[in-house]
């Protein structure tokens, strides 16, 4: 045996945990050994702010404390600042490192002048300017006013300097003094710190070592593979060993060792295309792709910042993405929300036309979604949701020549059961969200599926398995997207949405480089490392789903609403905004109704105000953004933007209606009649004395312990001791509708309850399950007295003192009713909460009813959603608080109770208890949310039999209560222009002029026609096939059933003359359950 056969140097098996943990040291810029590892070589040279090479001056835009932080003067246009500076009108002062800039929400402008060292210029290598002022900023070319790239403190700090022969650079930086997530004090979702300052940390020119920076990405992905791949894969262990081999090979005193390390990794673990877009063309083509990467940039239109700041976030984010597209040909980026595109066009037309439009034409930048904003779908009315698509899709068609095929709504708080139908009516057949991954009780069971609405319409739906729309393109993000797919038996691939989001930003160069490395590792090592594909479009991804699932027929189906098991408090937070939204929707309905009919009667002397109407709709739709209307924004959004905006909508609608009414009154000398905008309401004479002949009159009787209100149909007993309603009986039937003997509430109806409301986090968003059993009844009235006692109306006023400043005044009333309308008799309640000053309390009002059913019915947009009244399963438990619109109904076969309201959305029905949510008092992100005085109207409608069209129509009347005084002859003509007859459950909901009528001159017209038309929207309200007739005196030329966009014609219809009145044309229509239908009538 020779000495060579003797072991002199024994080897040990590496200890996995130790060797794995060691890998983090190599690229750690803040670790103890950063100067002995790769970070030492990230830069070849760096020069910080000095007087020879980098000079920076600053100018602070005037910002008076206490003034509106969203006024235009706080964010002056780029052009105005640069022109004024050129004229010497602005005083720019020299800036210094660590200098603070602020306060919160103010704007600071910087001028940057760079003179690169001669040897840097001669190198002809890529050079950088690195800027970090801890806030948001954007680089602006002073000659073209076109932005180049954006900065966000700590995340996006580098600007690639264009190559120049002399190394000279001059540009401006506009900086908004807020972080990417606003200015929250302590936590991002706390109320803002309005006195926050942002420090200039870096203003450096950098000569980077691109090899070292590339090795940083190589090693990062290799280390992630070592940490995150399954333990039974050889690729995991090889990654760990190679990582340690690289660290052993690296020499901190020899920069050339960087190249040697890269060469080792390319030989052993990556392919040769790891830095090229061609990497996605390599590998086994027969192997199915696990993960498809799509860049996106979710910009909340308002949230922890105002609309005014979002306008700047848009250009910052999208300019950065357009710059990246020039360097990464595979990069595809999607952005939604037509409102954001419109703001960009208004604020930066040069960028919109010269940069954005070409990127769209080159199929790198994609406008998706089809809605005006990424809207809430719980609270907006059905017509509002229809207009979200109408304006969104028409904007895209007008400016980009395309409409979206996908409803893009990754981040909203639940999805209405009518969304599939509204999407299909708007040219959309696909849907993407991921929010249900936030469910806090049940895990949603599907990733790819068909979502069917209550009418049967369905959308091909994908929920990215990575459970985020802001993936950083980490190895783990790709791995989770591949492994967390919940429907792999049907479709085994998933979409990964990568890019900084919520506050904007979007993908970074680093993310795109990481994805190239991950695909390179897959090309070399097989599918234990997921096969990642970048470069396809969202439409191509969905086409792949259809191809691999028998056109979607093999996929599972989810029917009904996509209820979000979280953020249930958003049905109630910011009550004033929700009330103004309801009022705005009603006023717009009335304006379109009266303006459309007036333009038909007087085409030569009255012009339909389409431009004003469209602008008002845009503002309403903007305020339906999924943080604004739900109530989860900071205070300034409501104080300075949304509330004033909605007040203005109501004011402008009222003004336009008044002008139209005055015009109509000038056209006739006939007596005036009062008209509503509901097709079943008939004109009433103005100031006509109420005739009580043939009516049940109202009366009030007082006793020692209680007060009785009665009108011959209903008898209502109010307890003087507690101030609540203890009995509601139908005297004609002998039926009691309340139950005070069983269940939790043995006191009575209109019982106010204050719940503790301390969710686990997310105050404005959440109310939690445990709060259901943590409550106190308000039982000691300060006053109970008769406030009205006439034959027309009787009422009792009840006052409760809640705190030293806060009191509740509730007026319970009963009106006289005609014998023929007695079945519609209801108990009206008007409640004023004065000086609501609670902290983390939730005010509700309860109604214990003598009803038993497993399900209750809640009005949703254009229909009904049924939900359980029991807690059988965890899915039932999760629905302890739900959303409704104008009514909730709880019925059994023989009788039922409907609760109507004029501005509330939260509700629950369990056991025998119906509960309407009134007010919350969260303290973040708005510290003053819902404080103050609130007026709320609701009603108890007891009825015989199950839910019927009586409830639907009463709820409409309860809300659409405005009356307009018109000459009698014109009023009759108004009624005859369009009406509906037939099945009572078919509702004629809206009337408007055709958008493409040339005479209308709409700014959203796409194909102007020299024709006149009105568009009529109807829907089936209760869930049954129905037949009705549209009746009109118009001299009809043709009739079309059209889509929501007024573009696609489904079919043509014919009209017949009414046999008893030949002036009337009757158009027979048939609707399936919960169908929404639009008809365009040409005349």
Swiss-Prot record:
EC numbers, comma separated: 3.2.1.24
Cofactor note: Binds 1 zinc ion per subunit.
Record bears the keyword Ribonucleoprotein: no
Annotated positions of the N-acetylserine modification: 2
Binding site for Zn(2+): 298, 300, 411, 626
Catalytic activity: Hydrolysis of terminal, non-reducing alpha-D-mannose residues in alpha-D-mannosides
Cofactor(s) named in the record: Zn(2+)
GO molecular function: alpha-mannosidase activity; carbohydrate binding; metal ion binding
GO cellular component: Cvt complex; fungal-type vacuole membrane
Class of this enzyme: hydrolase
Subcellular location: Vacuole
Keywords for this protein: Acetylation, Glycosidase, Hydrolase, Metal-binding, Vacuole, Zinc
Post-translational modifications: The N-terminus is blocked.
BP term (GO), one: mannose catabolic process
SMART domains: Alpha-mann_mid (SM00872)
Major place of residence: other
Catalytic residues of the enzyme: 411 (nucleophile)
Superkingdom, natural source: Eukaryota
Oligomer status and interactors: Composed of isoforms with three constituent polypeptides described as [(107 kDa)-n (73 kDa)-(6-n) (31 kDa)-(6-n)], where n is 0-6. The 73 kDa and the 31 kDa polypeptides may be proteolytic derivatives of the 107 kDa polypeptide in the vacuole. Oligomerizes in the cytoplasm and retains its oligomeric form during import into the vacuole.
Family under the similarity heading: Belongs to the glycosyl hydrolase 38 family.
Leftover remarks: It is not specific for the 1,2-alpha-mannosidic linkage.
Function: Degrades free oligosaccharides in the vacuole.
Protein's recorded name: Alpha-mannosidase
């Amino acid at each position: 045996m020779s000495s060579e056969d003797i072991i002199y140097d024994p080897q040990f098996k590496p200890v996995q945990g130790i060797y794995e943990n060691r890998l983090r040291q190599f690229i750690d810029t803040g670790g103890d050994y950063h100067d002995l590892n790769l970070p030492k070589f990230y830069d070849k040279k760096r020069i910080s702010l000095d007087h020879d090479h980098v000079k920076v001056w600053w100018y602070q835009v005037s910002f008076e404390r206490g003034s509106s932080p969203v006024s235009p003067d706080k964010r002056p246009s780029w052009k105005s600042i640069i022109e004024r500076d050129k004229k010497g009108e602005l005083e720019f002062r020299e800036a210094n490192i660590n200098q603070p800039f602020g306060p919160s929400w103010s704007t600071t402008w910087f001028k940057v002048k760079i003179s690169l060292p001669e040897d840097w210029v001669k190198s002809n290598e890529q050079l950088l300017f690195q800027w970090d002022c801890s806030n948001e900023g954007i680089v602006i070319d002073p000659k073209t006013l076109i932005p180049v790239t954006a900065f966000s403190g700590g995340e996006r700090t580098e600007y690639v300097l264009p190559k120049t022969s002399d190394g000279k650079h001059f540009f401006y930086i506009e900086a908004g003094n807020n972080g990417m997530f606003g200015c929250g004090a302590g936590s991002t979702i706390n109320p803002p710190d309005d006195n926050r300052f942002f420090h200039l940390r870096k203003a450096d020119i950098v000569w980077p070592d691109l090899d070292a920076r590339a090795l940083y990405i190589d090693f990062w992905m290799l280390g992630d593979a070592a940490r995150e791949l399954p333990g039974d894969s050889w690729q995991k262990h090889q990654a760990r060993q190679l990582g340690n081999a690289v660290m052993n090979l690296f020499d901190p005193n020899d920069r050339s060792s960087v190249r040697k390390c890269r060469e080792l990794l390319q030989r052993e673990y990556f392919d040769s295309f790891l830095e090229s877009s061609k990497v996605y063309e390599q590998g086994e083509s027969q192997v199915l792709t696990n993960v498809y990467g799509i860049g996106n940039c979710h910009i909340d239109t308002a949230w922890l910042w105002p609309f005014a700041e979002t306008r700047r976030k848009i250009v910052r984010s999208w300019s950065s993405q357009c710059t990246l597209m020039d360097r990464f040909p595979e990069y595809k980026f999607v952005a939604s929300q037509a409102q954001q595109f419109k703001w960009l066009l208004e604020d930066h037309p040069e960028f919109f036309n010269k940069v954005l439009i070409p990127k769209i034409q080159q199929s790198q930048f994609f406008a998706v979604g089809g809605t005006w904003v990424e809207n809430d779908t719980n609270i907006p009315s059905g017509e509002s949701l229809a207009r979200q698509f109408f304006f969104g899709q028409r904007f895209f068609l007008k400016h980009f020549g395309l409409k979206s095929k996908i409803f893009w709504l990754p981040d909203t708080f639940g999805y209405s059961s009518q969304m599939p139908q509204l999407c299909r009516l708007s040219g959309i057949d696909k849907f993407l969200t991921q929010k249900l991954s936030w469910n806090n009780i049940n895990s949603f069971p599907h990733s790819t599926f068909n979502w069917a609405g209550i009418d049967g319409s369905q959308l091909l739906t994908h929920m990215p398995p990575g459970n985020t729309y802001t993936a950083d393109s980490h190895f783990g993000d790709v791995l989770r997207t591949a492994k967390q797919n919940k429907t792999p038996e049907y479709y085994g691939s998933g979409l990964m949405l990568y890019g900084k989001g919520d506050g904007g930003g979007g993908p970074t160069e680093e993310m795109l480089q990481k994805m190239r490395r991950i695909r390179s590792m897959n090309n070399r090592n097989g599918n234990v490392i997921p096969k990642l594909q970048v470069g396809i479009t969202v439409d191509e991804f969905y086409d792949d789903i259809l191809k691999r699932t028998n056109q979607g027929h093999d996929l599972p189906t989810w029917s009904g609403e996509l209820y979000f098991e979280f953020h249930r408090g958003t049905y109630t937070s910011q009550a004033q905004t929700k009330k103004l939204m309801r009022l705005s929707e009603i006023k717009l309905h009335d304006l379109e109704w009266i303006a459309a009919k007036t333009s038909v009667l007087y085409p030569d002397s009255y012009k339909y105000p389409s431009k004003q109407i469209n602008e008002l709709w845009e503002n309403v739709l903007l305020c339906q953004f999924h943080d604004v209307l739900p109530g989860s924004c900071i205070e300034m959004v409501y104080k300075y933007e949304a509330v004033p905006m909605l007040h203005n909508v109501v004011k402008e609608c009222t003004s336009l209606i008044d002008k139209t009414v005055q015009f109509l009154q000038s056209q006739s000398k006939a007596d005036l009649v009062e008209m509503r905008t509901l097709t079943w309401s008939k004109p009433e004479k103005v100031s006509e004395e109420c005739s009580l002949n043939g009516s049940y009159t109202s009366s009030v009787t007082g006793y020692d312990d209680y007060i009785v209100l009665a009108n011959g149909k209903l008898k209502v007993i109010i307890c003087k001791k507690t101030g609540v309603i203890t009995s509601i009986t139908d005297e004609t039937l002998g039926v009691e509708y309340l139950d005070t003997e069983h269940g939790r509430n043995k006191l009575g109806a209109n019982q106010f309850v204050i719940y503790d409301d301390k969710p686990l986090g997310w105050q404005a968003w959440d109310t939690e399950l445990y709060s259901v059993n943590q409550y106190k009844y308000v039982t000691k009235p300060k006053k109970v007295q008769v406030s009205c006692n006439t034959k027309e109306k009787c009422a009792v006023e009840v006052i409760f003192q809640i705190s030293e400043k806060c009191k509740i005044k509730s007026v319970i009333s009963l009106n006289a009713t005609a014998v023929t309308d007695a079945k519609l008799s209801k108990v009206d309640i008007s409640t004023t909460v004065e000086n609501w000053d609670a902290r983390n309390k939730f005010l509700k009002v309860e109604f214990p009813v003598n009803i038993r059913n497993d399900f209750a019915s809640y009005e949703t947009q254009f229909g009904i959603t049924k939900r359980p009244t029991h807690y059988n399963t965890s899915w039932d438990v999760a629905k302890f608080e739900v959303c409704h619109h104008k009514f909730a109904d709880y019925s059994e076969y023989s009788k039922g109770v409907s609760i109507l309201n004029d501005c509330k959305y939260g509700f629950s029905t369990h056991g025998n208890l119906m509960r309407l949510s009134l007010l919350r008092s969260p303290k973040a992100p708005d510290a003053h949310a819902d404080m103050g005085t609130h007026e709320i109207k609701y009603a108890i409608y007891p009825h015989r039999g199950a839910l019927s069209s009586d409830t639907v129509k009463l709820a409409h009347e309860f809300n659409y209560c405005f009356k307009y005084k018109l000459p009698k002859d014109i009023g009759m003509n108004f009624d005859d222009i369009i009406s509906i007859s037939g099945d009572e459950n078919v509702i004629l909901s809206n009337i408007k002029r055709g958008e493409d009528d040339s005479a209308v001159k709409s700014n959203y017209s796409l194909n102007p026609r020299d024709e006149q038309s009105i568009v009529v929207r109807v829907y089936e309200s209760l869930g049954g096939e129905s037949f009705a007739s549209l009746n009109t005196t118009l001299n009809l030329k043709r009739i079309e059933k059209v889509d929501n966009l007024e573009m696609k014609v489904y079919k043509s219809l014919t009209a017949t003359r009414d046999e008893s009145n030949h002036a009337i044309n009757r158009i027979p229509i048939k609707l399936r359950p919960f169908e929404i239908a639009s008809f365009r009538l040409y005349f």
